[in-house]
């Protein structure tokens, strides 16, 4: 493909009409640096097919600059920017003039007003109307380009949160993909405004990333972050603090709940140059809880999700099935709690795997991976799972496995009982009819006979009733869970939806997507 630079809407639209391709759009204001190049490189790496084009825009948006800010001074060098963009993998560049983006002037077009609860935090507290200008221009660019995907950096975290919220509320059908802050060898976050710094200012400004890195290191050791100490370091290096806060990464409001994902956010002035930086604070790796009724496809999808994102996969349903199989194989009455306690007390339950795909479950060194999927186990597992001793035993085992995080678990009470502090909770469900069809396919594939889909649907409804009405850890959607109804969706569709939800809650900086 011949690399192109367009300056008018007409040129761009003519070219787009010839491509018949999905557009991956990366908006910039120019002044490109390795951070921008990283976004382009990642967008290229994660193309889902060859029929996708990476378009980079270069437009210094006057609406996001207040009076007295650096609009006129902002770096502009289209030739250098084009060279950096193309070398990173961009297919085309759109560098429009103001009149191309706002024909007749900005006053001739609708403007977006960001909710004050989001705008007036952090950067927006000092930069009045800044994010209104950002949101307005993004909508204009999206309207002109009509991309399938928008790629943004996590360095401008507040901007990312606002744009995600904007797209969600306006139901804009564009996927947002974000990537972590990139830094030079000294740890300094790349920014177009870094070029403003004199040599001596650059030395002073180095205390910004150094202090943030040290604070995160102390936090990871279990120590309390001392904001006063950080402020004194900045003062010693002639950095004027605009804000220095620990905030909730989504509401952007100050928080003292450091048991959840937090953001240490900083903005300082070094001379006349404004610099921002941040780091995420988390006591452990993320835990993802996926709950839902029988036959909703939890195991298949959760396993694929774990593989795609590099998580440990914990199939809690398989654990209950393994215990049920053990009880059946030893001819124990499912209501004889004394015998059940005795046999489980000395039993060894473990997962073994050489890969995510080949994960197997063993009980007392017997591979029961296939045995636990039999109709006999299926019909009895709910009776066994409702017993207090069984649930307490397996819940403890599950919590030990998830002690350090980095895990995705699926079951019926993961988000409510096993990991109530999970970082993301999904309630995956489908209609009983849909689940019966899936169950029939699964039984057929495994070589088991069944009477009819209608009977399977009846069994599923009975299982739902038992699971929902049991006194101990009943099946229910956690209050803070996101419900995903999967009727009519294939595994790939559900997986994509789950990953999008995950990325809206867990930044790349916290949990990077593994390279394929």
UniProtKB/Swiss-Prot annotation:
Alphabetically ordered keywords of this record: ATP-binding, Cytoplasm, Kinase, Ligase, Multifunctional enzyme, Nucleotide-binding, Pantothenate biosynthesis, Transferase
Any one GO MF annotation of this record: ATP binding
Active site: 36
Listed GO CC annotations: cytosol
Compartment(s) where it occurs, according to its Swiss-Prot or TrEMBL record: Cytoplasm
UniProt KW Lipid biosynthesis keyword: no
E.C. number(s) listed in UniProt: 6.3.2.1, 2.7.4.25
Listed pathway(s): Cofactor biosynthesis; (R)-pantothenate biosynthesis; (R)-pantothenate from (R)-pantoate and beta-alanine: step 1/1
Region (Cytidylate kinase): 280-516
Catalytic activity: (R)-pantoate + beta-alanine + ATP = (R)-pantothenate + AMP + diphosphate + H(+); CMP + ATP = CDP + ADP; dCMP + ATP = dCDP + ADP
Binding-site positions, beta-alanine: 64
Positions of (R)-pantoate binding: 64, 159
SUPFAM superfamilies per UniProt: Nucleotidylyl transferase (SSF52374), P-loop containing nucleoside triphosphate hydrolases (SSF52540)
Superkingdom of the source species: Bacteria
Binding site for ATP: 29-36, 153-156, 190-193
GO biological process: nucleobase-containing small molecule interconversion; pantothenate biosynthetic process; pyrimidine nucleotide metabolic process
Residue span of region Pantoate--beta-alanine ligase: 1-279
Record PANTHER family: CYTIDYLATE KINASE, CYTIDYLATE KINASE/PANTOATE-BETA-ALANINE LIGASE
General function of this protein: Catalyzes the condensation of pantoate with beta-alanine in an ATP-dependent reaction via a pantoyl-adenylate intermediate.
Family listed: In the N-terminal section; belongs to the pantothenate synthetase family. In the C-terminal section; belongs to the cytidylate kinase family. Type 1 subfamily.
Name listed for the protein in its UniProt record: Bifunctional pantoate ligase/cytidylate kinase
Originating organism: Prochlorococcus marinus (strain NATL1A)
């Amino acid at each position: 493909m011949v690399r192109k630079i367009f300056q008018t809407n007409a040129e761009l639209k003519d070219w787009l009409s010839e491509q018949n391709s999905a557009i991956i759009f990366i908006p910039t204001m120019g002044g490109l640096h390795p951070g921008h190049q990283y976004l382009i490189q990642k967008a290229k790496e994660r193309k889902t097919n060859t029929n996708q084009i990476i378009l980079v825009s270069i437009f210094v948006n006057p609406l996001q600059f207040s009076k007295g800010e650096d609009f006129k001074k902002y770096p502009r060098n289209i030739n250098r920017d084009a060279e950096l963009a193309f070398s990173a993998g961009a297919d085309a560049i759109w560098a429009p003039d103001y009149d191309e983006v706002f024909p007749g002037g900005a006053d001739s077009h609708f403007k977006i007003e960001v909710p004050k609860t989001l705008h007036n935090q952090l950067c927006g507290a000092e930069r009045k109307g800044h994010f209104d200008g950002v949101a307005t221009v993004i909508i204009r660019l999206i309207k002109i380009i009509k991309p399938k995907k928008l790629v943004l950096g996590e360095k401008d975290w507040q901007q990312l949160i606002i744009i995600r919220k904007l797209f969600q509320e306006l139901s804009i059908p564009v996927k947002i993909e974000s990537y972590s802050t990139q830094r030079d060898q000294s740890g300094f976050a790349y920014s177009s405004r870094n070029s403003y710094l004199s040599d001596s200012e650059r030395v002073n400004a180095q205390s910004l990333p150094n202090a943030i890195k040290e604070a995160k290191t102390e936090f990871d050791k279990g120590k309390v972050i001392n904001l006063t100490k950080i402020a004194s370091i900045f003062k010693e290096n002639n950095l004027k603090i605009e804000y220095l806060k620990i905030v909730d990464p989504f509401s952007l409001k100050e928080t003292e709940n450091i048991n959840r994902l937090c953001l240490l956010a900083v903005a300082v002035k070094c001379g006349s140059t404004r610099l921002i930086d941040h780091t995420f604070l988390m006591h452990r790796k993320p835990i993802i809880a996926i709950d839902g009724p029988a036959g909703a496809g939890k195991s298949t999808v959760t396993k694929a999700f774990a593989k795609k994102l590099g998580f440990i996969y914990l199939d809690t349903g398989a654990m209950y099935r393994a215990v049920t199989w053990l009880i059946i194989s030893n001819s124990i009455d499912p209501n004889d709690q004394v015998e059940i306690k005795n046999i489980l007390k000395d039993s060894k339950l473990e997962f073994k795997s050489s890969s995510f795909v080949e994960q197997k479950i063993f009980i007392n060194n017997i591979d029961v991976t296939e045995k636990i999927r039999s109709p006999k186990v299926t019909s009895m597992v709910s009776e066994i799972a409702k017993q207090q001793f069984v649930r307490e035993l397996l819940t403890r085992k599950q919590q030990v496995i998830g002690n350090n995080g980095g895990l995705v678990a699926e079951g019926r009470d993961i988000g409510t009982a096993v990991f109530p502090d999970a970082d993301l909770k999904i309630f995956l469900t489908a209609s009983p009819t849909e689940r019966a069809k899936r169950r029939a396919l699964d039984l057929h594939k495994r070589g088991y006979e069944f009477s009819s889909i209608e009977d399977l649907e009846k069994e599923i409804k009975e299982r739902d009733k038992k699971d929902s009405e049991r006194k101990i850890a009943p099946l229910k959607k956690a209050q803070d869970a996101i419900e995903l109804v999967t009727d009519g969706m294939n595994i790939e569709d559900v997986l994509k939806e789950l990953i999008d939800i995950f990325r809206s809650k867990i930044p790349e900086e916290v949990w990077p997507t593994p390279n394929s």
